[in-house]
Amino acid sequence: MVGMSRIILNNLFFFRCVVAVFSAHSLVISGAVHAGVQISQSPLHGGGDVPGNLAIVASIEFPTVISVANLADTYTPGVRYVGYFDSNKCYKYHYSSRELDRYFYPVASPRPQANYGCNTTGGVWAGNFLNWAATQTIDPFRSALTGGYRVRDTANETILEKAVMDRAYPGNFPRRTIEGLALTTSVPAQWLRFRMRIDGLGNRMRFTQFPGLSTDPLNTEGQPYDPSRHPLNSNDRGVYEVSVRVKVCDASVGLESNCVAYPSGFYKPEGLVQEYSKRVRYSVFSYKNDDYYLDDGGVLRARQKFVGPKTYYPEQGEKTNPHAEWHPRTGVLYDNPNPEDAKATTHRVGRTIGNSGVINYLNKFSQMETGKNTKGFDPVSELYYTAYRYFKRLGNVPEYSVLTGSVNEKYQQADAFPVITDWDDPIRYACQSNVVLGIGDTHTNFDKNLPGNTNTTGEPVKPQAVRNDRSIDVVKRMAQIFQMEGMRQQDAMTSALAPSFNFLVPGAGNNSAYIAALAYDAHTKDMRPDLEGDQLLTTHWVDVVEGGDYKIPISTNQYWLAAKYGGFQVPAGYDPDKTVNPLSEATWWTNGEYVNGDTKAKRADNFYIAADAEKMVASLKHAFSRIVAEIKGAGTGLSSNSARLETGAVTYQAQFFSGTWRGDLIAYHVDKVTGALTPFWNANFPAWEQRVIKFANATTLQDFTKKNLGQTALASASAQQINYLRGDRSQEGNVPGKLRIRSGIMGDIVNSQPLYVGAPNGRLYTTANFTGASAYAAFAAQQANRVPVVYVGANDGMLHAFDANTGKEIFAFVPRAAMPKLLEYTDQNYGHQYYVDGELTAADIYDTKLGWRSVLVGTLGRGGKGLFALDVTDPSNIRLLWDKTSADIGGLGNTLSKPMIAQTSDGTWSVLLGNGPNSTADNAQLIVMNLLTGHAAQVPVSKTSNNGLSGVFPWSSQSNGITDRVYAGDLLGTLWRFTFSDNAWKVAPLFTATYQGKAQPISATPLGAIERSTGRMWIFFGTGRALSSHDMDNKEVQSWYGLIDQGTTIPGRTRLSQVQIVDEGVVNGYAVRTVSDPKNIGTDGWYMDLISPKSGKQGERMIVSNMFRGAALIGTTRIPDNSDICKLSGSGFVMAINPFTGGRLGQWFFDLNTGGGSGGALNGNPVSGVGVSSAPNSPVFTGNIMQIGADDGTVTSLKTPSSGGLNINRVSWREILRP
């Protein structure tokens, strides 16, 4: 394991180059807005405004509709039950001679008691009781998704109606009785008992007092309950019925929590579909309403679309939606928002179809009076396959959507809604996330008629379209999953071919788990080769747990399998065709929860239980929060704990998800033979109360709690807000008074690259002679067993420290400069902000009083003007050195580069950094800080405004590890040389980068080396910047430079030799380029204009630092592309050239031969650069494997030579850090 010892080798006396631990990591993303240099407050990668696709797959047969939602057969006062009624309201019943006008309505008085009961005199009913008594499973599903089925929906009035109970099946909805306190506080009856029935009564509830003699009164027709005529006194032997409808969103008596205000002045109940309507496009799939068991598949009910009054396509902006599903002023739902689809089905049926749309279908399936009950068979795998085909653009299966029989029978099969056969393409953007949210019970039937299956028991002739689909073999995929679940290969295949998976009963059953095979295939293999990148499908599923059947062991639940294998975090380099080993738990089980409390049944992250109404609502809300988090995913760059490809080598990847701005940190084992990555942990956290979170209070660290923050910028925060920042999620919600809903407690990680700090290397400094060098070996021995830690900054306002072995957070720190705007993070209307977004560095330094110490220095980057230092010698007892803001250091701006730790000739251990843009003076300055005291000196380089100094490169000209020279560029294109002599810093320009007279900004840290054969000092850097959207539109030419420092200012390009990009092409599927091979080197070095020989001037730029790798200088470029909304940061190249000529290498560097060997030549010349389709970050080398992390979170791995013969001192940190 590579530890802290490798981090500080930059100070070894026999290396002239003093470099940072980790290569610079700059994304085309940014932070604060200032009058000087504009810096965007959100990532500029692209795709952030692209809407996601959510297909709702409703496996609806009658148990899902008619089963009881609130499972407890005994009503318990004080327990809250879920349904259309407000548990915190009391109701009266409105009677009318017209049945459609009968409903419950809330009253202002009386108010409910503490146990949700009411004073029931005067005809009052308790809303909580009515939820328990009358709610069917599908009601809370509808309520959570759409706000509920509106049977009356006018501008000023909304009445909801419960689901139709179309069967007299008391086994699905038991007949219930209440008495005692439950009765007296729930219903307006002076009875000893209150007996009720729901089953078989449509939208009504029947109730009576007496059980009867030979005939149960509940089996006789009841009379409509009229509170003015039926006092329900003690001797009342009547049988009554109420229509279970409820008036909602009446502001005069108090609004329910899901009521949304409209410009009309009234309110409408809404659900998750409306809430996320600006960010998600929806479609719906279901079955035809046909009870014939040989009817296969599913049908498209509503095609993919926005459902709200506006569309939000990023390239168009906000526009009026021609297929809006509700009125923008009143919120009234439209019956037929997609008349074209309704008309097409009308033509096929011969009877008018007057309903369409996503919300309408979700509210009205099984509600329409077609004369037919809800279907009784559910071939769920075939239904899922229908959605699978939709996203793969394979087209409708005609046999699935055929309507047969009489006009009335066709109408019933259509369920009075469109059956869409002319499918469109649901994927509008290559970077869209595609998600399925399904609901159903596990007692499925006859769903095996799919590609690859030959067991046709209970199945009709396989449709031709299904036979033609060779993209998947469900039997092989299912056998593979069974192997991953622990079965032997032979047993797995036998199980995959079995006549039934978990439901084999006479006249039904013969089901499969092929839904899991389909979900796994769509989640791990590109569905659309015709589009750029991988188009994948993520599956979430809600199991309604029919009859309390949880399917234990849990691996016998097909929905659990589908959610696990269709929702796990796919590791980089994962091969879905060859993998048979179990998935790492870190990829699919991060919630720590179990199904029904069974510790052997771990709840997959995308699997939700709806065994009762309360759980269903919570499950759906959780599912949507995860879905939105997945909709816009991206990742930052990579880091490594080792330069060697050996056992224990680990790569760390930071990620962000722009749906809810959640972050994650993932650790991957690196295969020592192939370099393949296998995840073994995700960032995980203690309970929020137990987290160790600190902030700086004067010279010490204090707990980040409400009581300690009174003298900070967070003094006005509430305890709930501070607890939220600590990770408490109990106060999250969408109603007034609640805090923003998150899908995880860590904020997004964009520009802060993970920093690994392990144990020191005792072999360092064995020949050094500076103060303290002789004591280093003892310090290293003392610290040999300390816990390795990965540090990273996140945009939740914290530096996080994770145990590198487990991923568990052990410490977090909130810098003062992050506090002023941190409460915005808790706001429901939060728009992305940067907080702790800067780079980190760490080193071992010598303190003459305390000896050797390990220290970490961090910046806020785009998040603010701040800088902090911590003593991390003991990870269990991290201590404060200092925490500074621009109020302490006037020249400090948005520091966008890595701070450097170096020892200067006066014996001081210092922090060196460029001040960055937007300082008070708005100019470029070198900041030099005493690392132990925090005292800062500022060295201005010019008075020119709209400028800032970028990353610094320290250098030891005497080869003794003592820094006496620093190189840094600024945003106006000047490369500066700072020289330390006579205890003072002197500054002079080395070169000003220009193209045709226009300055080229330098935003990356330069790199230096000595050319051994000549002794000449070289400095390498590229130009360009990416701080705002304006920068992304800029197509000006940027360049790559190699300059010789001969002690004087280089007057211009005339004394530099020109290198050109001369050829571009494709080798083994990789975009590649070669550069020229100049024979004569300019007096002062070389330059290369980043101009494509085929595409011309594209604005290609170099905004991350160069690095050395063996015989090569490595540079990473980016080519913005504002024509592609999915990747505004564009693409780019990782290039490898001769550092001292700027030309191509004499031998191959990139191994592009997928079958082994080099394969690294284009038209006979060694390849100089390999293209990456998403903008690349600096590569990480582990052994001879180069891993390139891109803005979209993908990782490209390439082999490179295992060693190089470049005749220079060892200056690459990845070489220096070897023991």
UniProtKB/Swiss-Prot annotation:
Its main location: other. Residues 1-35 form the signal peptide. Induction: Expression is not affected by calcium. Residues 212-234 are annotated as: Disordered. One of its GO terms (molecular function) is metal ion binding. Ca(2+) binds at Q958, N960, I962, D964. Keywords: Calcium, Fimbrium, Fimbrium biogenesis, Metal-binding, Signal. The keyword Zinc-finger does not apply. It comes from the Bacteria. Transmembrane segments: none annotated. Pfam families: T4P_PilY1. It is found in: Fimbrium. One of its GO terms (cellular component) is pilus. One of the three PilY1 homologs of X.fastidiosa, which are involved in bacterial twitching motility as component of the filamentous type IV pili (T4P). Belongs to the PilY1 family. This is Type IV pilus biogenesis factor PilY1 homolog PD_0502. It comes from Xylella fastidiosa (strain Temecula1 / ATCC 700964). The lineage of its organism: Bacteria, Pseudomonadati, Pseudomonadota, Gammaproteobacteria, Lysobacterales. The gene is pilY1_2.
